[in-house]
């Protein structure tokens, strides 16, 4: 049962450098940086907020390895995998060599090393 008036409001990502990570997500999601401090940068998008939070001694996940596993990742719904991948890489994402389902999902890392997927498999 969906609880009325509860919606996804924000995603917070740990990182070593909040400013470039926030700039990446703002550009990729068509958002804008709305708040900045030394340890936190908030990006406002059309539907939600994404924030980059500075963490001392931050270490990115090593997925698909297990030394430091990912705790979560984003699946971004896109219309065209190739075009969306090219834009994400142009903005600073890195495409992983390991691609478990490249015809449906493209796995990338954001500038702080967080894995995320581009996919055409999420209905509108």
What is the predicted role of each segment?
Residues 1-22, 28, 71-78, 119-124:
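N-terminal beta-strand motif that seeds the catalytic metal site of vicinal oxygen chelate
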Residues 1-16, 34-35, 42, 44, 50-51, 62-83, 104-109, ...:
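Vicinal oxygen chelate
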Residues 26-27, 86-91:
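Short amphipathic alpha-helices in soluble, non-transmembrane regions
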Residues 36-39, 69-71:
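Intrinsically disordered, low-complexity, positively biased terminal segments
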Residues 56-60:
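Short amphipathic beta-strand starts and helix->beta connectors
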